[in-house]
């Protein structure tokens, strides 16, 4: 993401929920477009984080002796 990269999956999810609530009310077209774009970026961020965790869990399933590293590779 360009502007405010979330610090965590939970932060991104919380922001997505906030954007969704805002967009359900009255919102000027330009603001709605900006919110949609930000939401799109947040969804991609969350999908990436979930895919990373899923890969790490597959390693555990394949061989329970491997260490689970939840630290970001970024």
Swiss-Prot record:
EC number: 3.1.11.6
Major localisation: cytoplasm
Keywords: Cytoplasm, Exonuclease, Hydrolase, Nuclease
Catalytic activity line of the entry: Exonucleolytic cleavage in either 5'- to 3'- or 3'- to 5'-direction to yield nucleoside 5'-phosphates
Known partners and oligomeric status: Heterooligomer composed of large and small subunits.
Biological function: Bidirectionally degrades single-stranded DNA into large acid-insoluble oligonucleotides, which are then degraded further into small acid-soluble oligonucleotides.
Protein name: Exodeoxyribonuclease 7 small subunit
Originating species: Neisseria gonorrhoeae (strain ATCC 700825 / FA 1090)
